[in-house]
């Protein structure tokens, strides 16, 4: 299996993003987005997926964090798709339940080439929840869905994320990111029993 690495740059009038990703890393992560809680989530994602992940993002956070967070998720998804290459020899499917104190979250991944995202189970109040920003740029939990959708669509994977139960918005969000991380780790890992593309169609 060749090196599974990617470097993607994306610049718009709203943000400038650079993501470097190594799927066969050891969890070395360096993230700077200008949104401290999002940095924390990306650190958790890279660490628990055992990816080497470098993210540098500058955006119009003086307006709010939305553009920077969503655009970073887009570029991460693009890097993930590029690093996967021809997808030969991978497990393809990944699944993880992650507890965090009172919260339990679940994520399932299919590296299918058919982008789709289902995000469900967050308490209704999450659409109004703000995490961090005292001081600094706050993270609005309503963007969680946008993050996971952007990753799925740009990596061309099917991603299902659900909250089974939980109360604290920080714990809920972090459990979701960690569940996605562990599911991705399992899905992209080499399978010693598979040499070709893991599909009856012969392509993903």
Curated annotation (Swiss-Prot):
Primary localisation category:
cytoplasm
**Leading EC class:** lyase
Source domain of life is: Bacteria
Pathway field of the UniProt record reads: Amino-acid biosynthesis; L-histidine biosynthesis; L-histidine from 5-phospho-alpha-D-ribose 1-diphosphate: step 6/9
In Pfam terms, one family for this protein is IGPD
What molecular functions are annotated in GO for this chain? imidazoleglycerol-phosphate dehydratase activity
What does the record give as the reaction this protein catalyses? D-erythro-1-(imidazol-4-yl)glycerol 3-phosphate = 3-(imidazol-4-yl)-2-oxopropyl phosphate + H2O
Q: Which GO terms describe its biological process?
A: L-histidine biosynthetic process
Q: Which UniProt keywords apply?
A: Amino-acid biosynthesis, Cytoplasm, Histidine biosynthesis, Lyase
Instruction: Enumerate the CDD domains for this protein.
Output: IGPD
Q: What is its EC number?
A: 4.2.1.19
Which subcellular locations apply to this protein? Cytoplasm
Gene Ontology CC terms: cytoplasm
| PANTHER family recorded | IMIDAZOLEGLYCEROL-PHOSPHATE DEHYDRATASE (PTHR23133:SF2), IMIDAZOLEGLYCEROL-PHOSPHATE DEHYDRATASE HIS7 (PTHR23133)
Family label:
Belongs to the imidazoleglycerol-phosphate dehydratase family.
**Under which name does UniProt file this protein?**
Imidazoleglycerol-phosphate dehydratase
**Source species, please?**
Rhodococcus erythropolis (strain PR4 / NBRC 100887)
